[in-house]
Amino acid sequence: MKSIGRLLKSVVQWFDSDYGSDDLATARDRADKVDPGRCAAFLFLHACCLGVLWVGWSWTAVWSAVFLYFVRMFAITGFYHRYFSHRTFSTSRPMQFVLALWGAACVQRGALWWAYTHRHHHKHSDEAEDKHSPVVDGFWWSHIGWITSKKNFPTDYKQIPDLAKYPELVFLNRFDTLVPIIFATGLFLTG
């Protein structure tokens, strides 16, 4: 019965990241190991690219992919990193929401989670507490493994009070799969 409960909790957390993450201390005490459920979705998404072998390609699809790559990379470097993590520039509240929405389409979780983990990284760079240090944990863990770890899943809103005061950002952070699902569906429907 416990395993069914854990499975259901895991499924609900795919759609509501904050579900069951009230106890951050418990999450921090978990072993740093890869969560198979999160890995399966990660691998499936990348394997879907092989679908081009069956459906073919077009120049429109290629140029769309190139355009979206650069636009979404800019969203991560310019907005998630420079704005939300380091607050290197200021903007209006509506534009802040647009920036978070744009970044959410990149499937790197919510802006608040990103800012929290990045600020934590700077506070503990290359120390045992650093969530993704290549010096402490090696190349693969620092680039891929840490993202799929249950230990690193929750957002500690107390560490980002400047951002957590905006309910619209908390919503995007909490339901971080919503924007990518809508974005992918829109791309699929437009051909």
Per-range role (PLM):
Residues 1-191:
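Non-catalytic, topology-defining segments of multipass membrane proteins
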